[in-house]
């Protein structure tokens, strides 16, 4: 699944356009490497996302095309940093 779509479906970032801008701006890495919006993600990958002055690390647990809002948090595991809504 594309990175920008995963960030939106998992609700780590609420809108796909914002997810795309974040990755184009160099604020998202996959397994320590800079990521483009079209980068593919899979279970086990570690995402690092900079939100202003804060950094959050997530491990991808599952990938699904659609998911209910209440189940979205089960798609990832927060590894560290501070979660931003």
Stretches found by the model and what they are:
Residues 5, 16-21, 27-85:
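Strongly charged
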Residues 1-11:
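Extended boundary segments
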């Amino acid at each position: 699944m594309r990175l920008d779509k995963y960030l939106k479906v998992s609700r780590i970032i609420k809108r796909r356009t914002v997810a795309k801008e974040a990755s184009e701006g160099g604020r998202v890495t996959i397994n320590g490497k800079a990521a483009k919006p079209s980068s593919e993600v899979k279970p086990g990958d570690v995402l690092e996302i900079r939100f202003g002055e804060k950094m959050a690390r997530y491990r991808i647990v599952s990938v699904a095309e659609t998911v209910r809002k209440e189940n979205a948090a089960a798609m990832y595991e927060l590894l560290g940093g501070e979660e931003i809504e």
